Amino acid sequence: MELELDLSFFYKTTILPECVLIFCLISILILDLILKIKDKNVFFFISLVSLLLSIFILIFQLKEEPVISFLGNFQADNFNKIFRIFIALCSILCIPLSIDFIKCTKLAITEFLIFLLTATIGGMFLCGANDLITIFVSLECLSLCSYLLSGYTKKDVRSNEAVMKYLLIGGTSSSILAYGFSWLYGLSGGEFQLQKIADGLVSTEMYNSFGSLLALVFIIVGIGFKLSLVPFHQWTPDVYEGSPTPVVAFLSVASKIAGLALLVRLFNIVFPFLPNQWHSLLEISAICSMILGNLVAITQTSMKRMLAYSSISQIGYLMIGLVTGNFDGYTSMIVYLLFYIFMNLGTFACIILFGLRTGTDNIRDYSGLILKDPLLTFSLALCLLSLGGIPPLSGFFGKLYLFWCAWKTGLYFLVFIGLFTSVISIYYYLKIIKLLITTENKEVTSYVQSYTVSSFSLLSKNSIEVSIIICVIASIFLGIFMNPIINILQINLHLNTFTNI
C-alpha cells in the first residue's frame, strides 16, 4: 500500500486524538482558573472521558490508509496508532491510581492532571513523529513533564533527590540524542525528515560510513537512558524509590512504549543499511538488562526498588522482539507490551493501596497480609506471577510467543538467557508471595496488624481497587485470547509502510 503524502497542517483526523487531549487540558485550566470549581473530582472525569475518546478515535482510524501529514512531520500508520492507544491506556489506568493518592497527600489535582496529560500528548506525538525536530520536541514534552511529576511531592526529601537525578540524567541523555541527530543531519546533506535522511545517506554514499555508525551509537545511548537499558539504568532505582508511586507506575510503562515506537521507526527508516550493527548493540544490551535487572532485584528490600530492577529486566525481554527485526518479532513485542501494561500497573496499584494504608514500602512489612486483606494479597500475587511468566497467566503466553519468534529467527542464545532470567525472576516474586501468605502470628508485622480491611465488593468506591480488579482480570484472561489478539495485530500491521516486513 502506497503512503499518501499531504502537506496540509491537518489531514482528515490524523492528529484528532491528540487534539482531544489538548482541548481537555485547556478545558481543565479554564475551569480551574475562571470558574474555580470546588469539586476537583470532575477534572478526573473529564480526563478519563477525553482519553477514552482518543482511544476510540484511534481504533476507528485503524481502518484508514497510512498518511504523512502535519506539514510532512507526522506519519500516521497502524503501527504508531497501536502504540498511541497503549500510551492513552496507561494514562486511563494511572488516573484512578492517583485519585486517592492525591487526596491523602493533599497535593494539587489540577497541576497533576495537566502534567500527566501533557506527558501523554508528548508520548503520542513521539510515536508518529516523522522528523528530527518533532521527535526531539515530543520527547522533551514527555521528559519535562516526567521530571515535574517525579518531584511533585515537594516536601519529600527523597522526591527532591529523585527529580534532581532524573533531571540531570535526562538532560544528559537528551544532549547525547541531539548529538546523534546532528550527525544524521550533516551526513544526509541537511535533511530533517526520516525518509529524506535515509535517501540523503544513500545519495551521499554515507549510509555505511563511520559517521552513520557513530550516529547510531549516540541515538541508542540517548534512547537507552529513557528506556533504562543496561548500562544506562543507574538512575532508575533512585527515581522509582523517591517519586510518587502513581507517577512511577505511569513512567514505568509509558516511557517504554514511546521509546520502543521511536526505536523501531528509526531503525527501519533511517538505519536499514546497518542491521547487523544495531542488532548486535541491542542484543548485548538486552542480555545485560535481563541478567543484571533480575539478579539485583533479588537483593532489594524496597518494593519500588525491586520493581525498578524488574522493569530493567522487562525492557530486556521487549528488546528480544525488536532484535528479531521481522514481522513476527514486532508483533510479539506489541503483544507482550500489552500484557505488561496490565500486570505491571496492577502490581503498582497494589503497592499504592498498601502504602496509603500503612505508610511503608518495605517488602518485609507485607508479611501476613493475607490475614487482613485476602483480595489485595490475591491480586498482588497474580500480578507478580504474571510478570514472572507463570502459566496460565498472560505473562506466560506473552513470553512464550516472544521467545518462539526469536527462536525461529535463530536467536538461540538470547532465548536461553531470557528463559534463565525468567526463572530467576520467579524466585524473587515467589519470595514476596511467601511473605504475603504467611499465617504465623510472630511473622505478621505491626503494619499489617493495624491494617484497615478492604472491601470485597466489586462496586468498591476506592478507585485504586477498581484499577486493581481491571488489571488482574486482564492479567488472567488476556493470555487465553492471545490468538485473536495476534490475528488482529497482524491484520493491522500489514498496513505498515516503513517496516521491512
Curated annotation (Swiss-Prot):
Keyword Ligase among record annotations: no
Record flagged with keyword Translocase: yes
Top EC group: translocase
Example GO biological process: photosynthesis, light reaction
Protein topology in the membrane: Multi-pass membrane protein
Primary location class: plastid
Keyword set, alphabetical order: Chloroplast, Membrane, NAD, NADP, Plastid, Plastoquinone, Quinone, Thylakoid, Translocase, Transmembrane, Transmembrane helix, Transport
Transmembrane segments: 15-35, 42-62, 82-102, 107-127, 132-152, 167-187, 210-230, 244-264, 278-298, 307-327, 334-354, 378-398, 410-430, 466-486
EC number: 7.1.1.-
InterPro entries: NADH-Q_OxRdtase_suN/2, ND/Mrp_TM, Ndh2_N
GO molecular function: NADH dehydrogenase (ubiquinone) activity; quinone binding
Catalysis: reaction(s): a plastoquinone + NADH + (n+1) H(+)(in) = a plastoquinol + NAD(+) + n H(+)(out); a plastoquinone + NADPH + (n+1) H(+)(in) = a plastoquinol + NADP(+) + n H(+)(out)
Recorded GO CC terms: chloroplast thylakoid membrane
Subunit field text: NDH is composed of at least 16 different subunits, 5 of which are encoded in the nucleus.
Protein name: NAD(P)H-quinone oxidoreductase subunit 2, chloroplastic
